[in-house]
């Protein structure tokens, strides 16, 4: 009768001195792992987005959340005139980043996605360049 009580107390004391798993979120920020797939961002090269508008990212996206429209500059080089990602549809799989031939898209470690309006979840080109 006393042995189960002692075994239970042993387990309780062992767990009492372990490092806590829970973080007090607004005060303590978790650090995501290096492989964490967070919010998307466009990379910049020579003060322009690196995207050459090859349409591989919207083609490979299983959620169909990426919209790209091409434009041409004076040297007839293609660039993304319109680049949008609907974060409400995105499943954060990372296929768009893997498919990009010029490494123009990356996934950041940012994970806070709270907003009040649905329109704020559609990330346009300018917002993707800020990250």
UniProtKB/Swiss-Prot annotation:
InterPro entries, alphabetized: 4Fe4S_Fe-S-bd, 4Fe4S_Fe_S_CS, NADH_quinone_OxRdtase_chainI
Name of the protein: NADH-quinone oxidoreductase subunit I 2
SUPFAM superfamilies the record matches: 4Fe-4S ferredoxins
Role: NDH-1 shuttles electrons from NADH, via FMN and iron-sulfur (Fe-S) centers, to quinones in the respiratory chain. The immediate electron acceptor for the enzyme in this species is believed to be ubiquinone. Couples the redox reaction to proton translocation (for every two electrons transferred, four hydrogen ions are translocated across the cytoplasmic membrane), and thus conserves the redox energy in a proton gradient.
Domain of life: Bacteria
Chain sites annotated for binding [4Fe-4S] cluster 2: 61, 90, 93, 96
Family from the record: Belongs to the complex I 23 kDa subunit family.
Keywords recorded for this protein, A-Z: 4Fe-4S, Cell inner membrane, Cell membrane, Iron, Iron-sulfur, Membrane, Metal-binding, NAD, Quinone, Repeat, Translocase, Ubiquinone
Cofactor binding annotation: Binds 2 [4Fe-4S] clusters per subunit.
Membrane topology category: Peripheral membrane protein
Catalysis performed (reactions): a quinone + NADH + 5 H(+)(in) = a quinol + NAD(+) + 4 H(+)(out)
